[in-house]
Amino acid sequence: MKKILLLLLLPILSFSQTLVPSSVHIYLDQYMSETSWDIKDTTGNIVAADGPYYNAVNYQSMIIPVMLPAGNLTFTIYDSYGDGLNGALWGGLDGSYYVKQCNDTLVFGDVPNFGFDTAHAFGSDACPPVLGCMDP
């Protein structure tokens, strides 16, 4: 009976998706309510999204923890005004953005004048094991 139950559950277990702890770092300019972002899989499904940041303060750092599936993904950041995170254009400070996973930076957004949006393709994968003795 246990073998039959295991055989029935095996297809369900084999389709379970590996989720990897990650984080999206958004360093806003002074027009924070214009900024939003999403992460999509290869079929266009949104797997994570946030913004616009109506309640943020100028230049606030937003660190959003997300669980991302393993595989190829696309991070897209949006600016509803069309000047990106280019706050210096209007006498302020520029913003930036990053996607991090397993202490690696997968998306590095240091060009603030991206217009209405910009997309970055990246690969998400399980974190490698930490090597070495873990006993104190």
Regions found by a protein language model. Name each.
Residues 1-136:
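Residue-level recognition of alpha-helix boundary/capping or hinge positions
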